[in-house]
Amino acid sequence: MSKEKTAFIPKQYFAVVAVLLAIMMSVLDGTIMNIALPTLAHDFDVTPANAIWIINAYQLVITMTLLSFASLGDIYGYRRIFLTGISIFVGASAACALSDSFWMLTVSRIIQGFGAACVMSVNTALIRLIYPPQILGRGMGVNAMVVAVSAAAGPSIAGSILTLGSWHWLFVINIPLGLAALVIGHRLL
């Protein structure tokens, strides 16, 4: 394996950062809300059985649309679906942070789920396009590690954020990270 075929150029590193940031946020938001549910149920004066829909809405939308967005990525391009997904995700994160009712938060989470599904559906395809074939396994491994660590770290990150601020910050944190991924992805993917 020659060095020039497997060497990464800085542009590729930043493109990978954009993809990994986006998948990290999408996975984190699936697990980060568990810790906040009692607070949300209290703040919105809903039962715990109803509050769980804040999580379920997000997960159900991802599950129902993941394959459809992957197919759209094949048709319209992975980059377009990825950037659209990040845009939707960031906008919905802002709406979640500004939510003042249970229904507004749940609807915002549904919209956020559409953005996350866009990102998740084309994530590995973008990794495949960024990494040279000789080191594609490394790229897939890094991607899998980010997904696993994000899922496992979600409750701990949520607990840390909630000790410092309100539940709104669980969504506000997505905005600068998402905008960074959007700008980098727009320039380098």
What are the residue ranges of the model-derived segments?
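Transmembrane-helix bundle of Major Facilitator Superfamily
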Residues: S2-R187
